[in-house]
């Protein structure tokens, strides 16, 4: 395995720091020999399997959280609680991750990573439309699997979606009301209807290129799009969102017929 493909020593150190866990406890959590992480930090090269596992931990706090819950008996109670606090803190650093978590909690984990993508889009759009404020900073990307927030999708797809209590200060009162309205509205529709609606929305958006030449829909384009549709459909209150989505889904059914 080429050295450049292997997780680096600084990256392993970041895992230990991010999740407040020692070298031996991390090895125990992973079910490895207790000196494994120590050896890697001293310069031993991990196998591809072990390196990939560590990269998953580095890139996905959710994946680490799942591992921690499943194998907490491998740690002392003190080590478990310290690491749990750290990983939950890491997850709350991301606004888009916390917006997704709001929906996971609302649906009591009965939602998929793919469905969350559409709810994030409409939440962002109506936040820009009503309040001129973005809920999160991630840009909408055009992807082949219709996942505009692909990094989050990849993270949510690598482990079961779990409920955990959110700090009440994460969202403002108006943001929480908007997210609740979106959650309640989409609770009436299945995956197929939600995906078809997402596909139709994507076809109406103005696409541009970012610095890396990725196809994206800018925040300003989403704002313009939603303000226009809100004016056209007379959406003046949060409660009007339900009627708009219902109308859009019915139009899709008629188009299919």
Predicted stretch roles:
Residues 1-18:
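A short, Lys/Arg-rich alpha-helix, primarily the initiator
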Residues 3, 11, 35, 39-257:
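Domain-edge interaction signal
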Residues 15, 21-30, 37:
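Short alpha-helical "recognition helix" segments of helix-turn-helix
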């Amino acid at each position: 395995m080429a050295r450049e493909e292997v997780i680096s020593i600084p990256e392993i150190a970041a895992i230990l720091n991010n999740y407040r866990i020692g070298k031996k406890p991390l090895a125990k959590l992973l079910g490895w020999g207790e000196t494994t992480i120590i050896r890697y930090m001293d310069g031993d090269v991990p196998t591809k399997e072990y390196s990939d596992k560590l990269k998953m931990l580095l890139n996905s706090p959710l994946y680490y959280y799942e591992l921690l819950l499943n194998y907490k008996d491998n740690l002392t109670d003190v080590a478990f609680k310290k690491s749990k606090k750290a990983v939950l803190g890491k997850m709350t650093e991301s606004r888009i991750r916390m917006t997704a978590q709001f929906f996971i909690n609302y649906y009591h984990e009965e939602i998929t990573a793919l469905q969350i993508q559409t709810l994030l889009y409409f939440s962002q759009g109506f936040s820009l439309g009503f309040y001129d404020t973005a809920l999160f900073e991630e840009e909408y990307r055009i992807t082949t699997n219709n996942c505009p927030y692909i990094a989050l999708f990849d993270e949510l797809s690598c482990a079961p979606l779990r409920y955990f209590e959110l700090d009440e200060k994460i969202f403002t009162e108006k943001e929480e009301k908007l997210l609740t309205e979106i959650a309640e509205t989409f609770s009436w529709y299945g995956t197929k209807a939600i995906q078809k609606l997402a596909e139709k929305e994507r076809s109406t958006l103005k696409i541009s290129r970012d610095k890396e030449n990725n196809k994206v829909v800018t925040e300003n384009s989403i704002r313009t799009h939603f303000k226009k549709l809100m004016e056209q459909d007379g959406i003046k209150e949060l409660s009007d969102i339900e009627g708009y989505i219902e109308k859009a889904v019915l139009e899709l059914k008629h188009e299919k017929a």
